[in-house]
């Protein structure tokens, strides 16, 4: 079995969970507490991520959300007050790798292009339809007006798992849980 090193910053209470339960699992409540007033927006995207990631590494039934990790200790969030950093060696088969730059596109309701030519084709399509920028496509005032484009955007999101830039600053990783 092949192993890889991952790093993640978590709340200090996770130490208690790891000691007493033997695992750390991310929960909807934790996302809400961490993201505060923008949690609904992130939870919608995280739900979609879970759906996609489950196709790559099977999600245990009791898990709600994955745990975000860095593939590099240099690129991992540094410890701050009431937070700890875990350095882990885990089976590679349990890791969900994805492109963090492409994930940022998903967070902004953007199209994830196959390449530069695909990006130009998509922008040309938006312009020809009078949509301007795809930021607008998900506005409620455009409901039903651009359904086909919205579907095309959402269908492109699984490309976050197609990693073309292997830089430690681009590649991110998720685990369904951290085991003791």
Predicted regions and their residues:
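Conserved NAD+-utilizing ADP-ribose enzyme module
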Residues: 1-40, 63-65, 76-84, 90-180
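Short alpha-helix boundary/capping and kink motifs at helix termini
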Residues: 37-62
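Divalent-cation-assisted or electrostatically stabilized phosphate/pyrophosphate-binding catalytic cores
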Residues: 72
């Amino acid at each position: 079995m092949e192993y890889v090193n991952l790093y993640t910053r978590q709340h200090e209470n996770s130490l208690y969970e790891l000691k007493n339960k033997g695992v750390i699992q991310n929960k909807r409540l934790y996302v809400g507490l961490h993201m505060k007033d923008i949690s609904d927006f992130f939870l919608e995207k995280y739900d979609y991520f879970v759906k996609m990631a489950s196709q790559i590494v099977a999600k245990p039934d009791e898990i709600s959300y994955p745990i975000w990790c860095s593939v590099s200790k240099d690129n991992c969030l540094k410890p701050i007050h009431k937070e700890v950093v875990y350095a882990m060696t885990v089976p590679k088969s349990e890791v969900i790798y994805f492109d963090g730059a492409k994930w940022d596109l998903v967070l902004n309701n953007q199209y994830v292009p196959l390449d530069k030519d695909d990006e130009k084709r998509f922008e040309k399509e938006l312009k020809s339809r009078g949509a301007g920028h795809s930021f607008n496509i998900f506005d409620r005032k455009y409901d039903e007006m651009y359904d086909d484009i919205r579907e095309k955007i959402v269908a492109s999101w699984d490309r976050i798992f197609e990693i073309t830039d292997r830089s430690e600053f681009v590649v991110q990783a998720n685990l369904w849980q951290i085991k003791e």
